[in-house]
Design a protein with these regions (language model features):
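N-terminal lobe of the biotin/lipoate ligase/transferase fold
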Residues: 1-156, 209-210
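Long, positively charged amphipathic alpha-helical accessory segments at protein N-termini or as interdomain linkers
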Residues: 2-8, 111-159, 164-233
Length: 233
């Protein structure tokens, strides 16, 4: 199976949402055509924007509309799963528009592959990403040894958020990996609805900048390998 990988640079959220929808509809129209084309993977950087999933809670937005406008950020209530998150400069946003039927997988397995690809991406930087039971995305934590020798996991912080939509086995929306994201934007929300967990980035964990271009290229390789896809030339 083949996939088209597109780097579209910096694009406003609404414009990219419409672009996703166009690709989504085109892929739906081609279902059952017998081709080896499995879809498109978009890599994009958005200007500052908050998005709330279809079942999200507006109370997780901690600032009002006036403050939002003063900061120069946008807000959209959208049709993906998950709660509230932020997209902005230095963040690798990835939207796989894929036909899961052609890939022979279901939605749960699809999300597992997204998570695994992120875990492998941050591992390239020596970062131990992991899953958190009851939550999607990829997380980091610190393992602390107590005086009695017991080891506990503390300081859970999210490095990648995942929120997707699927209809008739075709996906849209996707993931947001914090490469060099300004994390102050997350202080204005309860990220993904959590009030007891933090947010981090590759840059913060390493103490050196890892930019969008570098991290997105690593992620692309991991996605292609884990979905067993070849990139269309």
């Amino acid at each position: 199976m083949h996939v088209d990988c597109k780097w579209v640079g910096r694009m406003p959220y609404k414009e990219c949402w419409e672009y996703q929808q166009t690709l989504f509809n085109e892929l739906l129209a081609k279902q059952g055509d017998g081709s080896e084309h499995a879809g498109t993977i978009i890599f994009v950087e958005h200007p500052a924007v908050y998005t709330l999933g279809k079942s999200g809670n507006m109370s997780n937005m901690l600032i009002d509309e006036a403050r939002l406008k003063a900061l120069g950020a946008e807000f959209y209530h959208i049709d993906r799963g998950g709660d509230i998150t932020f997209h902005g400069e230095g963040q690798v946003v990835c939207y796989p528009i894929l036909d899961l039927e052609k890939l022979g997988i279901g939605l749960r397995r699809y999300i597992e592959i997204l998570e695994q690809s992120i875990i492998e991406t941050v591992a390239e930087y020596g970062i131990n990403g992991r899953r958190l039971e009851g939550a999607t995305g990829v997380w980091l934590c610190d393992e602390v040894e107590l005086p009695n020798g017991e080891k506990v996991e503390r300081n859970w912080r999210k490095i990648c958020a995942i929120g997707v939509k699927a209809s008739r086995f075709v996906t849209m929306h996707g993931l947001a990996l914090n490469a060099a994201t300004d994390l102050k934007w997350f202080t204005m929300i309860n990220p993904c609805g959590f009030i007891d967990k933090g947010v981090t980035s590759i840059t913060k964990e390493l103490g050196r900048e890892v930019n969008f271009d570098e991290a997105s290229r690593v992620l692309c390789k991991k996605l292609l390998a884990n979905f067993k896809l070849e990139r269309e030339q």
